[in-house]
Amino acid sequence: MERFLANEAATLELGAQLAQHCPAGCVIYLHGDLGAGKTTLVRGFLHALGHVGAVKSPTYTLVEPYSLVGPETSQSIYHFDLYRLSDPEELEYLGGRDYFAAQSICLVEWPERGEGWLPRADLDIYLQHRADGRQVRLLGHSQAGLTLVEQLKRLL
């Protein structure tokens, strides 16, 4: 699925819609150059699920955990930024396997830096700069990822 995002608000909305339909245990890879909107999309995702604080790219910490507790659910979400990762094995030393537990949602920026160590993505999101906004492409790989793409097609 491909869509044009005219501005930051459209990127936030995509993140919000994604959050509303994303099942627990989903792994989402975010691809794009610096400034392409990856962290903006994550911000929309987290705010849609009730996070009220700032959302920053965990460039130096590699992962930022979020525990969102609602009236009916509790959800662990992990936002990774692997831009500064020098070796995928560093994720092992950070306890990375614990983050990819069955019920957590993992949003991974720069997943190519963790290639060979990271689990397969349910969904790949590619963001690309254009003069008048951004182009986004979503590719589902698992049943969960394919279902997400179909749901988003109907909403966006």
Across the structure, where does each feature detected by a protein language model lie?
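Short beta-strand-centered segment that lines the nucleotide-binding/catalytic pocket of NTP-utilizing
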Residues: 51-66
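Hydrophobic anchor at the beta1->P-loop junction of P-loop NTPases
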Residues: 28-30
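The conserved Walker
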Residues: 34
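Short phosphate-coordinating micro-motif centered on Lys-Gly-acidic
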Residues: 1, 86-91, 97-156
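N-terminal pre-Walker A segment at the start of P-loop NTPase domains
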Residues: 1-17
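Conserved lysine of the Walker
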Residues: 38
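Phosphate-binding P-loop
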Residues: 18-25
